[in-house]
Design a protein with these regions (language model features):
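Exposed loop/turn and edge beta-strand positions of beta-sandwich/beta-sheet ligand-binding modules
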Residues: 72
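Short secondary-structure boundary/capping segments
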Residues: 4, 49, 66-68
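Alpha-helical residues within the helix-turn-helix
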Residues: 30, 52-53
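Short, well-ordered turn and helix-capping elements at secondary-structure junctions
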Residues: 32, 61-63, 80-82
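Amphipathic alpha-helical dimerization/coiled-coil segments
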Residues: 81-109
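Beta-hairpin "wing" of winged helix-turn-helix
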Residues: 54-69, 77
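Basic amphipathic alpha-helical segments that dock to polyanions
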Residues: 44-46, 50-51
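N-terminal helix-turn-helix DNA-binding core of bacterial DNA-binding proteins
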Residues: 2-43
Length: 109
């Protein structure tokens, strides 16, 4: 049985597929907001922590950078279990929406 993921967690996983490995939380947040999903930093990092505990993502501390005053960024990477979850979600959405374009065009007139 596939694990249940909330809409926000799904969006985070889709974002990580798009952005690749070693992605900083700010980049994830920016991508989510560009795609129309406003998100607070607290909500994002709480969801990332949940996804990490479930084994879908891992995080590591990057190197200190001068632009951050020597602080290190936490970087996130999608794991194979997260990739499989995205593949299942994608297939489910594709199956559910098959033929929907034709129906919607008819409704538009």
């Amino acid at each position: 049985m596939s694990p249940v993921l909330g809409e926000f967690e799904q969006r985070i996983l889709f974002t990580l597929i798009r952005l690749g490995s070693d992605v900083h939380g700010v980049a994830i947040r920016n991508h989510l907001e560009e795609s129309g999903r406003a998100v607070s930093p607290g909500a994002l990092y709480t969801a990332l922590d949940r996804l990490e505990k479930r084994g879908f993502v891992t995080s590591r501390l990057g190197e200190p950078t001068p632009d951050r005053g020597g602080k290190r960024k936490r970087l996130y990477t999608l794991q194979p279990s997260g990739e499989r979850a995205v593949a299942r979600l994608y297939e489910s959405l594709r199956s559910m929406t098959q033929g929907l374009g034709t129906r919607l065009r008819k409704l538009e007139g």
